[in-house]
């Protein structure tokens, strides 16, 4: 049986469809320096030599700091972490109009993303005829079966799959009204949403002269993430916390425009890191504190960070992601999760919600019972 990792809180701290982009690999990245890789999408792809973000120290990868947070650390800045914990304590049940309602209100926690995100969240459990079906492995099922879950917590599904037009980095894209419609069908208004998990590593993909390289990929992810956060506040104005995750390893070197490939899956984690750093450093474009001016973003931090190098355990915590164990391979793109992969990723997210001070005040029932 494959070992399942119990991740401690320091890690927590964090797919989908893309537009086509291609180009030659960067000559200064030894892992990408060879001529264009033979395009392939299967389990035969071995370790690339690229390091997980969590395993990199100062100036440790192409001159860029590693670590999930500034100063090559995997632990959040103390002031920023304390702010997140304080915001978490301010989250209360809201009625349809967004006003506090401790009796009939809801604490709504949902996601931004599409098929891979939905698999982790709900496991396609409302359609057992789908190719991938994880009815008990998913986050929603496991969270709602906790004895100490907050009884006012609501975990609705949002977007289920890409329609070919979705772009969550564009505030005018149909993704947003479609997400609102999906929530409305479950009795949820935009004013009730307070927490989101954004599993969206396709932010900003597009063609360019540098091809598949760092820092270009990371900058695309960072800038797209900022635009997404602005759109979130436009459509869900009471959102206070957003957890950000980049994608797991992709057993594909073919940028075919359908899903995230390598090395973008690897590089995009730096983009999330840089967006969080911008907020920690006080960038007005990501301000969450009304005492410091106009609020332009929710408070952000890492959700689960999934990337490992083609099944090689991470030095930081031993996490592995393997093909075919964790990846659905039958009639697949080798990117969607298998039920075992859903179980692993949902477990990481659930573990964070049960331990992270930015989550426990609203996720768990303070009385200890449901």
Predicted regions and their residues:
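Conserved SGNH/GDSL esterase-like catalytic core that processes O-acyl groups on lipids
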Residues: 63, 70-71, 106-215
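Loop/turn elements at helix/coil->beta-strand transitions in domains of secreted/extracellular proteins
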Residues: 105-108, 148-155, 190-195, 235-242, ...
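Extracytoplasmic/secreted proteins, especially bacterial periplasmic and envelope-associated proteins
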Residues: 119, 123, 131-134, 138, ...
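Active-site cleft segment of glycoside hydrolase catalytic domains centered on the general acid/base Glu
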Residues: 172-190, 199-231, 236, 251-271
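Sec-exported extracytoplasmic/periplasmic mature domains
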Residues: 117, 125-129, 184, 201, ...
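Bacterial N-terminal signal peptides
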Residues: 10-23
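Catalytic His-Asp segment of secreted/periplasmic serine-dependent ester chemistry enzymes
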Residues: 249-370
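N-terminal secretory targeting modules
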Residues: 2-8, 23-112, 116-134, 366-370
């Amino acid at each position: 049986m494959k070992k399942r990792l119990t991740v401690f809180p320091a890690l927590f701290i964090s797919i989908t469809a893309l537009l086509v982009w291609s180009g030659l690999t960067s000559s200064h990245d030894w892992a990408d320096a060879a001529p264009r890789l033979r395009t392939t999408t299967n389990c035969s792809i071995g370790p690339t030599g690229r390091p997980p973000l969590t395993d990199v120290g100062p100036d440790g990868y192409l001159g860029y700091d590693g670590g999930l947070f500034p100063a090559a650390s995997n632990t959040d800045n103390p002031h920023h972490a304390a702010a997140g914990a304080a915001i978490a304590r301010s989250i209360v049940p809201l009625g349809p109009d967004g006003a506090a309602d401790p009796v009939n209100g809801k604490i709504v926690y949902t996601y931004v993303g599409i098929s891979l995100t939905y698999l982790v969240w709900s496991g396609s459990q409302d359609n057992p005829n789908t190719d991938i079906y994880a009815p008990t492995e998913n986050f929603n099922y496991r969270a709602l079966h906790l004895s100490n879950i907050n009884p006012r917590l609501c975990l609705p599904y949002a977007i289920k799959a890409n329609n070919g037009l979705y772009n969550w980095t564009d505030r005018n894209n149909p993704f947003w009204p479609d997400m609102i419609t999906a929530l409305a069908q479950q009795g949820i208004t935009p004013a009730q949403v307070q927490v989101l998990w954004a599993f969206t590593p396709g932010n900003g993909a597009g063609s360019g002269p540098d091809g598949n390289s760092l820092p270009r990929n990371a900058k695309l992810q960072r800038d797209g993430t900022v635009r997404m956060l602005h759109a979130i506040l436009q459509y869900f104005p009471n959102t206070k916390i957003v957890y950000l995750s980049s994608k797991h390893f992709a057993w594909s070197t073919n940028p075919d425009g359908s899903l995230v490939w390598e090395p973008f899956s690897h590089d995009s984690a730096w983009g999330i890191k840089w967006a969080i750093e911008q907020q920690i450093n006080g960038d007005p474009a990501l301000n969450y504190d009304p005492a410091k001016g106009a609020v332009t973003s929710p408070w952000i931090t890492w959700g689960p960070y999934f990337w490992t190098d083609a099944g090689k355990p991470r030095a930081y915590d031993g996490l592995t992601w393997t093909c075919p164990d964790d990846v659905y391979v039958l009639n697949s793109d080798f990117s969607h999760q298998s039920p075992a992969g859903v179980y692993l990723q949902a477990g990481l997210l659930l573990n964070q919600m049960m331990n992270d001070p930015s989550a426990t005040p609203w996720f768990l029932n303070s009385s200890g019972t449901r």
